[in-house]
């Protein structure tokens, strides 16, 4: 009888996607060998838990094919593609252009309210320009990257990722324009983001989390504006506008 073995993540700290993907894939393949016979023990590759006990029968049939029964943290059932993804959202908000610009351009406070943003530090700043370092967390993984911001008060905030192991391309653009005529404390917010991960494995793993971050982004900034500037201007339902595009 095989000796009991248990491996766990302890003191994870900041792991890169490369480290985690490699470990998850290895554990998934290892767990594949024993799941064909549906033993009571479950092998959770995504949690980093290796099999605790293997019966003699499982050892004897270790070479048996188990393609259909295997499940790993990453799914390879479909073709691996790493195309650039784009998301855009337009909506009317009950805050002024200046108010929304101030919230979006204040990168230093992103860590307080932006989904999965663990750290945000402005390294340098001058009129119309800022350089910031951000740390994004997809539990239990943390990735750091540098972002260059172009600032045009109160119309534009553009951020471009210049380094980092996670993204081959990452660009976000916020545009603020006048809102509803007769409602001075309203504005039209156009948010767009495009991103492409450096590797296919990163793309397969991170898309699960990153898509959700993108979808929550505008709402997170709207809530932040409410916390700073108070209730938004009431907008009649027939004048409200909200449009989303995703590719």
Curated annotation (Swiss-Prot):
Name listed for the protein in its UniProt record: Coenzyme Q-binding protein COQ10 homolog A, mitochondrial
One term under GO cellular component: mitochondrial inner membrane
Family membership noted in the UniProt record: Belongs to the COQ10 family.
Taxonomic source organism: Xenopus laevis (African clawed frog)
GO biological process: cellular respiration
Function summary: Required for the function of coenzyme Q in the respiratory chain. May serve as a chaperone or may be involved in the transport of Q6 from its site of synthesis to the catalytic sites of the respiratory complexes.
Gene3D superfamilies: 3.30.530.20
Coiled-coil region list: none
Domain of life, source organism: Eukaryota
Gene name of the record: coq10b-a
Keyword Metal-binding among record annotations: no
């Amino acid at each position: 009888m095989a000796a009991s073995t248990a491996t766990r993540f302890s003191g994870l700290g900041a792991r890169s996607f490369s480290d985690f993907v490699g470990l998850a894939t290895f554990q998934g393949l290892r767990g594949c060998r024993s799941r064909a016979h549906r033993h009571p023990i479950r092998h959770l590759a995504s949690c980093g838990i290796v099999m605790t006990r293997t019966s003699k029968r499982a050892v004897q049939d270790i070479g048996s094919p188990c393609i259909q029964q295997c499940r790993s943290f990453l799914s390879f059932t479909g073709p691996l593609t790493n195309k650039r993804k784009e998301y855009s959202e337009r909506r009317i908000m009950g805050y002024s252009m200046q108010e929304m610009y101030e919230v979006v351009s204040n990168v230093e406070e992103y860590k307080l309210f932006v989904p999965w943003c663990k750290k945000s530090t402005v390294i340098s700043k001058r009129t119309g320009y800022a350089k910031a370092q951000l740390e994004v967390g997809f539990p239990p993984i943390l990735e750091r990257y540098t972002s260059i911001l172009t600032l045009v008060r109160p119309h534009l905030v553009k951020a471009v990722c210049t380094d980092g192991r996670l993204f081959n391309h990452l660009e976000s653009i916020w545009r603020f324009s006048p809102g509803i005529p007769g409602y001075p404390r309203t504005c039209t917010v156009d948010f767009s983001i495009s991103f492409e991960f450096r590797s296919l494995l990163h793309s397969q793993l991170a898309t699960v989390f990153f898509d959700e971050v993108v979808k929550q982004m505008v709402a997170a900034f709207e809530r932040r504006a409410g916390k700073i500037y108070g209730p938004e201007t009431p907008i009649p339902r027939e004048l409200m506008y909200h449009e989303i595009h995703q590719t």
